[in-house]
């Protein structure tokens, strides 16, 4: 335990130094976030904020690529993180668009196909201690849904200072407790949490750096693969809390607009709706933290009481 705490203590300051250097480097080079005109007007002041702070999430898992127990989790994090990095770089090159949504989903599918080869191939799906499904076809379908959906969901959540990072932190703390009997996996999660804390040091409102797609996709790949390894694929519905709500708000908005030519929300994802309703950014973030935590606790109660 002392060794674990020592490693994370040192890692925290290493990540802080890396992020501080990365922020200063981008400022000196004039690199920063481009805010699109159709976004909330309150975000225009964020223009020019350094990006791609999520690179530290890839650094946190890279050493674990060389261990059998953590290879799949690390590979998932790195591959999805690299997809996000390419998207960030394209956004810097062409400020209006990065990788097109359909192409991004297709690339996510290719990555998931690669990851399936290295996955545990345990086709059983549990709810608590109860075996719900034992079917390779259904499991493969669920595997692809999870690995594609979670990174994209966290990417949609990453729209306010500290929102995606803070909610991911809550999810990972619960996954750390659940994984504590797997020493290498627990160490990897603890280092990711440490990287997140270092990132949030600079991402708290007003943010000095954004995680970028590289961070959102890396976190998504990490959380999704952890749920597969820990056999909590169904519990992930609750562990995803706010990520799921944000994604559903986009789906509902698009579907209803195509159907009725009307919008349910002032803007989606739903955190922008509350911004346009006049809520302060910090109030939205903290209330979303609370909702996310309550959903996870509710899911855990159902999981263990089953």
From Swiss-Prot:
Q: How does it sit in the membrane?
A: Multi-pass membrane protein
GO BP annotations listed? cell division; cell wall organization; peptidoglycan biosynthetic process; regulation of cell shape
Pathway noted in the entry: Cell wall biogenesis; peptidoglycan biosynthesis
Recorded GO CC terms = plasma membrane
Q: Where in the cell is it found?
A: Cell inner membrane
Role noted for this protein:
Catalyzes the initial step of the lipid cycle reactions in the biosynthesis of the cell wall peptidoglycan: transfers peptidoglycan precursor phospho-MurNAc-pentapeptide from UDP-MurNAc-pentapeptide onto the lipid carrier undecaprenyl phosphate, yielding undecaprenyl-pyrophosphoryl-MurNAc-pentapeptide, known as lipid I.
UniProt protein name? Phospho-N-acetylmuramoyl-pentapeptide-transferase
Q: Which organism is it from?
A: Dictyoglomus thermophilum (strain ATCC 35947 / DSM 3960 / H-6-12)
